[in-house]
Regions:
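Recognition helix of helix-turn-helix/homeodomain-like DNA-binding domains
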Residues: 37-52
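Residues within the alpha-helical elements of helix-turn-helix
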Residues: 24, 35, 63
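Short alpha-helical "recognition helix" segments of helix-turn-helix
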Residues: 31-33
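Short C-terminal boundary/hinge segments that cap the last helix of small helical domains
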Residues: 65-78
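Key DNA-contacting residues within the recognition helix of helix-turn-helix
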Residues: 19, 44-45, 72
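A short, Lys/Arg-rich alpha-helix, primarily the initiator
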Residues: 1-27
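Short, basic-rich loop-to-helix N-cap that marks the start of a DNA-contacting helix
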Residues: 49-62
């Protein structure tokens, strides 16, 4: 990987995008935590994260029926 690629900071904040979609769907943090099998506090921590593990992102995408990977696909095209 070249230096230009290594120093590139992510433009998107995945936690904020997940939070926005959850609110758009009018779902509660409690509902989302139950679906993820975790505590509400972990959901709030997720909202603050700028990066995410792909397996977790897949689970989130399935739960919310929303392709969050699409944001990363768009980043690749820029």
């Amino acid at each position: 990987m070249d230096k230009q690629h290594q120093n590139k900071t992510p433009k998107l904040h995945i936690g904020s995008l997940i939070k926005r979609e959850l609110e758009k769907q009018e779902r509660t943090v409690s509902w989302f935590a139950r679906k993820l099998c975790c505590d509400r506090s972990n959901v709030y921590k997720l909202f603050k994260r700028s990066t995410i593990d792909t397996e977790l992102l897949l689970r989130v995408s399935q739960i919310l029926h929303y392709d969050f990977f699409d944001f990363y696909k768009k980043e690749l095209c820029e």
